[in-house]
Amino acid sequence: MSQLNPKVGFVSLGCPKALVDSERILTQLRVEGYDIVPSYDAADVVVVNTCGFIDSAVTESLDAIGEAMNANGKVIVTGCLGKRPEQIREAYPQVLAVSGPQDYQSVMEAVHAALPPRHDPFVDLVPDYGIKLTPRHYAYLKISEGCNHRCSFCIIPSMRGDLVSRPVDEVLREAERLVRGGVKELLVVSQDTSAYGVDLKYAERPWRDRMYQTRMKALCEGLSELGVWTRLHYVYPYPHVDDVIGLMAEGRLLPYLDIPFQHASPRILKLMKRPGAVEKTLERVQRWKAMCPEITVRSTFIVGFPGETDAEFESLLDFLDQAQLDRVGAFAYSPVDGASANALPDQVPEEVKHERLARFMAKQAQISALRLESKIGSVQQCLVDVIEDDIAVARSRADAPEIDGLVHIQNGGELGLKVGDLVDVEITDSDEHDLFGDALPSGPAVQQPGRTLNLQIV
């Protein structure tokens, strides 16, 4: 063991919720005096935070464990795949410990057993917002754990349990700390953001001399007081989602909804155990756009679900034409160990699934390209993520990190833009994924009808 601080390597896999779990473990490790190192060779022990949602994620997680075992030999496994300890130990019987998601205590106990901590705490070395794995200018804000739904294709409840919401004041205080630490964008995540607070009966809690309900709209009202971008992810399509559109129209919340519709056939949605009123869904999308013309709607879909007919797949393509969604992700259905959909009849052949997925994505690519083309000539507020060869790579209010498009600011180097800058960009070109443009220079605001334009270095 090192004569100085004990050293821990860390591998984080999976979704943004798992990333937050990793950040919490890393924060506790630093508080207790452990150094976090970037290589297996430098580590005294390695923690692997796994994903187990779909078969490809299981394979990736097992491969990561194997790589850590081969390179280091002392490995602690946690995360969603940890809910299947027998699968891990069958492949790698010499792992030191296995625990499930958000079981921070078990992870720390395993680290202590393998690598005793120093006795003096290092709290002063850890910022009050904790250790973050994202760039400094944005952060994921997890508001709850688990899910009360039982979608037939999903095993998340068996891994992460039923919904457990964090009290609203606790979430708002964490958001405050993040903003004090330089965060310009808060990405609200959970398994079901729109169910936030139902398990707490929407209990009221005080924050900044005001009472707030533990409810999605009230949380958004509180977050809007912090003066940074706030983006909602994983919103289940409940009717009360309509309540936050007004906040978007007022500029208090980013006009962006990540809302997984999954399919457009009422019969398939019923088999998925998802809401099935497609006509109402289309009406609501149109109503959101009427209330907030700038709104961006992102969604995800599954093609080739068991029993999906040619006609039902065509109805899904028709839905894309009618809904005109801005951003869409999709994947071909694959059985997930433990999911009830595995037992459904009429499984779709693999070649049909992949042919449908290709057609689906081609259809949406056409829609996305036209929607992005319509932004040429407009001015978009953007947040700079990276500087590459005198070009600033940024995201507009319509783009979440990792999953959406980018804005390539051609004169970013000329203007001396930096990562984390907020800047107004005049859009000059587009393709099916990204926008291209020039930042408007700082100095006196440039007036255009309906708005003031100005470079903001914040």
UniProtKB/Swiss-Prot annotation:
Residues 133-371 form the Radical SAM core domain. Coiled coil: none annotated. [4Fe-4S] cluster 1 binds at residues 15, 51, 80. GO terms for cellular component: cytosol. Keywords: 4Fe-4S, Cytoplasm, Iron, Iron-sulfur, Metal-binding, S-adenosyl-L-methionine, Transferase. Residues 6-116 form the MTTase N-terminal domain. It is an enzyme of class 2 (transferase). Catalyzes the methylthiolation of an aspartic acid residue of ribosomal protein uS12. This is Ribosomal protein uS12 methylthiotransferase RimO. It comes from Xanthomonas euvesicatoria pv. vesicatoria (strain 85-10) (Xanthomonas campestris pv. vesicatoria). The gene is rimO.
